Swiss-Prot record:
Protein name: Chemotaxis protein CheY1
Organism, scientific name: Helicobacter pylori (strain ATCC 700392 / 26695)
Cofactor: Mg(2+)
Keyword Phosphoprotein: yes
SUPFAM superfamilies, alphabetized: CheY-like
Primary location class: cytoplasm
Amino acid sequence: MKLLVVDDSSTMRRIIKNTLSRLGYEDVLEAEHGVEAWEKLDANADTKVLITDWNMPEMNGLDLVKKVRSDSRFKEIPIIMITTEGGKAEVITALKAGVNNYIVKPFTPQVLKEKLEVVLGTND
């Protein structure tokens, strides 16, 4: 299963990718910002989950989510936002834009596992 991780921090991308690897997800694409993410998603339409940060240069995560949701190929792709923006207003804004689940940094691997299970419908 192909996943796309988007974060301007290479450290955060590595942490997320390592966590996903421990969970059995090996086919993980990476992007540094929304523009690069859109290019990778466009070239890899079989991507099953998008995990994105909010605050990034060039195109932020919220704008990326809106762009993804406006494309008929990706209307149903599960999107998890992982960000430091943890206020109630930010969560509501992200959910209204089309995010399926939301994680506030810092987070534990267990939280990412559970959020992935929820968006993929594999939770017990």
